[in-house]
């Protein structure tokens, strides 16, 4: 059962800033008793904070892995290790034997799929920034699945990893949540570390950098702060958009950026949007973000999603037929993280029920996801979202006007309808003013070409996909 908590720790460590993770999640203790998972907090403040903000996520993760509701109890332990004080009321106990089954299935799945980052043992003495790289060795180029959605980002990353400070400096990678930006970022660091073990490498989330600036300010230790950050060979900053409205942080990063670039040291940045569109960040920083190379990471296309699933199944030593992989890939389209979660659920259900993994079992395991997806995304919703985005009337989606101002958004909407729904080309054509299915096919081909060659179109589509799915 400890493996389940390791999975939770790994997921939260990936999604939260280091400060949030160390303050709220890492102090929790975990135990399992009679079909109930128990989390023990060190004090009432942490207990209430976790209950309000993270308990639902932990419960959802348990249900995602097991495809069955699991009781999560949040309690309080005192310093003398007495019986915990319960905050959350327990749900009805699982059926006899359920605890053993749950423990067995969590153990099997979490050992093979989505390995969590191991929790670090408390160091005997504090380490300086340059002694702690922050890298996760699990993120490497050899286990990163490449497709049209990320091939440019991967190629640029490899070039930078092999020639740091000379090619594409800075390298700016942008895209939505769960698309592999962090994987690419850390793969660069791990590659350089393997080639140059003595290199000073630092990976961190932008919020951690903000925290370091605050600490330096509080302790009047900016000389030490600058010495550590300005002496790096490779600086990897994740989610730079978190610098928004933090003027002192932006000022310090401006100095660090200039110092590293002048010394021909490599900087790599990830963000959820294009450099010029980052809100509430100083213009001089946004300009510098574009000095090197800017590349997008987009949602994976169907073939890439299938390849990701097959690779993860292989790593988990699970047999996954291509027809099952295609079925999963057609249902889960937004991110690699969601693909991973869907596969976890299917494997757990197969182990739990004793059935072989086939399309019918996959449908059962993902029935809630399929139902939600079916309710949320419709052609009408896509048409309205695209029309709003391009500031045209929805009626232009059905009209015969061929002006580029109307035709381009219409073609993009057709393409998104094909990607985000299960409708056929003829059905999509009918929804767009009774157009022939070949018109829809031509629109999809044309937009796909533009997507590969026009950065603005690629960015528009990535934004639209996120808006539609949210």
UniProtKB/Swiss-Prot annotation:
Keywords: ATP-binding, Cytoplasm, DNA replication, DNA-binding, Lipid-binding, Nucleotide-binding. Its main location: cytoplasm. It is found in: Cytoplasm. One of its GO terms (biological process) is regulation of DNA replication. The keyword Kinase does not apply. The keyword Iron does not apply. Residues 1-68 are annotated as: Domain I, interacts with DnaA modulators. One of its GO terms (molecular function) is ATP hydrolysis activity. NCBIfam families: DnaA. Domain I is involved in oligomerization and binding regulators, domain II is flexibile and of varying length in different bacteria, domain III forms the AAA+ region, while domain IV binds dsDNA. Oligomerizes as a right-handed, spiral filament on DNA at oriC. Belongs to the DnaA family. This is Chromosomal replication initiator protein DnaA. It comes from Methylobacillus flagellatus (strain ATCC 51484 / DSM 6875 / VKM B-1610 / KT). The gene is dnaA.
């Amino acid at each position: 059962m400890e493996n389940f908590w390791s999975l939770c720790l790994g997921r939260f460590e990936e999604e939260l800033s280091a400060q949030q993770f160390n303050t709220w999640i890492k102090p929790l203790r975990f135990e399992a008793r009679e079909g109930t998972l128990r989390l023990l907090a060190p004090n009432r403040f942490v207990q209430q904070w976790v209950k309000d903000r993270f308990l639902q996520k932990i419960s959802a993760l348990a249900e995602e892995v097991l495809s069955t509701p699991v009781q999560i109890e949040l309690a309080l332990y005192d310093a003398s290790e007495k019986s915990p004080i319960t905050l959350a009321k327990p749900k009805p106990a699982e059926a006899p034997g359920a605890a053993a089954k749950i423990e067995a299935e969590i153990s099997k799945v979490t050992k093979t799929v989505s390995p969590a980052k191991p929790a670090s043992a408390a160091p005997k003495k504090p380490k300086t920034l340059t002694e702690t790289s922050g890298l996760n060795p699990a993120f490497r180029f050899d286990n990163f699945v490449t497709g049209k959605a990320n091939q440019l980002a991967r190629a640029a990353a490899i070039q930078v990893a092999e020639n740091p400070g000379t090619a594409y400096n800075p390298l700016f990678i942008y895209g939505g949540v769960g698309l592999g930006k962090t994987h690419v970022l850390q793969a660069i660091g791990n590659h350089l570390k393997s080639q140059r073990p003595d290199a000073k490498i630092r990976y961190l989330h932008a919020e951690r950098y903000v925290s370091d600036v605050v600490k330096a300010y509080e302790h009047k230790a900016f000389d030490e702060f600058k010495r550590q950050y300005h002496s790096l060979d490779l600086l990897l900053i994740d989610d730079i958009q978190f610098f928004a409205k933090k003027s002192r942080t932006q000022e310090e990063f401006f100095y660090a950026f200039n110092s590293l670039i002048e010394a021909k040291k490599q900087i790599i940045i990830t963000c959820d949007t294009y450099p010029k569109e980052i809100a509430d960040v100083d213009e001089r920083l946004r300009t510098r973000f574009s000095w090197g190379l800017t590349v997008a990471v987009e949602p994976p296309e169907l073939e890439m999603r299938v390849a990701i699933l097959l690779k993860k199944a292989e790593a988990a030593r699970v047999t996954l037929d291509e027809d099952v992989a295609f079925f999963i890939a057609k249902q889960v389209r937004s991110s690699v993280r969601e693909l991973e979660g869907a596969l976890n659920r299917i494997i757990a259900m197969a182990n739990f029920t004793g059935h072989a993994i086939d399309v019918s079992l996959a449908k059962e395991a993902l029935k809630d996801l399929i139902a939600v997806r079916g309710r949320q995304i419709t052609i009408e919703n896509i048409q309205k979202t695209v029309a709003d985005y391009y500031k045209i009337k929805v009626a232009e989606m059905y009209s015969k006007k061929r002006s580029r101002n109307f035709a381009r958004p219409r073609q993009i909407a057709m393409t998104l309808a094909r990607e985000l729904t299960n409708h056929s080309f003829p059905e999509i054509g009918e929804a767009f003013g009774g157009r022939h299915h070949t018109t829809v096919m031509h629109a999809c081909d044309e937009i796909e070409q533009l997507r590969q060659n026009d950065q603005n179109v690629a960015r528009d589509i990535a934004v639209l996909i996120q808006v539609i799915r949210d």
